[in-house]
Amino acid sequence: MADAVSNIARGNSTWRDHQDAWENLFAAEPVRQLKALHDQFQLRYCLTTNWTGLLDKAATLNVLRLSGLGFVASNLHARWEVDRGHGAVRRSDQIEAWLSHHSDQHDQWVVLDSEVRGPDVLNWPENLAAHTVSCCSDVGLTGFEAGAIRERFLQLQPSQKN
């Protein structure tokens, strides 16, 4: 993958020259699970991935679209990535800073992340931990995690009077 992006950046190839890499970048089941959640809740996305430090927005959009996540590319929040500057080293600090600048999100958000070990995750603030769903990094989003996200968003919806 890194070679493909590097070759594209140097002008030695185009995005479409690496279609096989994009098609296999994300496993089909996690993409299906995320698409089902997207269709149900009309999600918007902010990325915390390290990719945002390597790719600009145009490149990120290309990777998302070519790898089957066009619905994510089309629904990125206007501030589509967390700010990695201003001394925020831990991902939890980056997410909290993003949320503090986007109070319009209220509690209408969920962090979906791979299970990462270490002090950054173990010491997440309680308010972030309550909104976080972790999936196995070698498996991705399964029906189990998607169910937890669905339950969280259903709890956030205003109750309907009959």
Question: Locations of the language-model features?
Answer:
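Generic alpha-helix structural propensity
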Residues: 29-32, 46, 55, 90
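Acidic-and-aromatic substrate-binding clefts and catalytic sites of carbohydrate-active enzymes
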Residues: 24-25, 53-56, 84-86
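Generic, low-specificity signal for short hydrophobic/alpha-helical stretches with a mild N-terminal bias
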Residues: 16-19, 42, 46, 131, ...
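A structural signal for short coil/turn segments at secondary-structure junctions
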Residues: 38-41, 102-104
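Substrate-recognition element of Asp-dependent hydrolases with the DxDx(T/V) motif
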Residues: 41-61
